[in-house]
Amino acid sequence: YVTALLVKTLRSAGYDVGYYKAAISGARTVEESDAGFVNRFAQIREPEDMLLSYLYQNAVSPHLAARIEGNPVEKDVIMSAWERVTAAYPYVTMEGSGGIMCPIRHDEKAVYYLEDIIRWLRLPVLVIADAGLGTINRVVTTCEYIRRRNISVKGIILNHWKGGVMEEDNVEMIEEITGVKVLARVKKGDTALDIDPETIISLYE
């Protein structure tokens, strides 16, 4: 949902932004998946075969879905897909699958986590997290892990924002501990991000 808001905000401002996700589980078709939702919501009209490389029906982690369905993620497929989508759009948002350590493939031939895909594609990261109780620890540990892998953290967006003293304090503590700015707060039903498009587009540089 946050990725859809991000892409829609930029496209509404006139930026030609595409979308890509390496693997999605828990959907029967691309149309039913997160990728299909982003494509519709942000009005990208991107061909389905450019949106997504691997679609798994089982609603489990991609590595397990791949094992069950016999279709493991291959690095060369991801690299080729990324080359194609970046050739079609000057800006591309890649949505992650789960958290930074989400297993994408884990078998006797190869072991990949989300962080591996990020490093293959040489991408910076925007951390998306729930705004509520427990988010300070989750965001701080995620940012610290990402930095230890020499991946740039461009900013943080807090989802399911309700407001109040606890969530405002979460923002202050996260920014103080990580040194990374909370760029936006997303409430249920929001149709755009509360951040100007120029700030968002600068994250792609």
Regions found by a protein language model. Name each.
Residues D107-A131:
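Inter-motif core of Ras-like GTPase G domains
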Residues C143-E205:
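C-terminal lobe/tail of nucleotide-utilizing enzymes
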Residues Y1-P72, D76, A81-R84:
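N-terminal phosphate/diphosphate-binding loop that engages ATP/GTP or pyrophosphate donors
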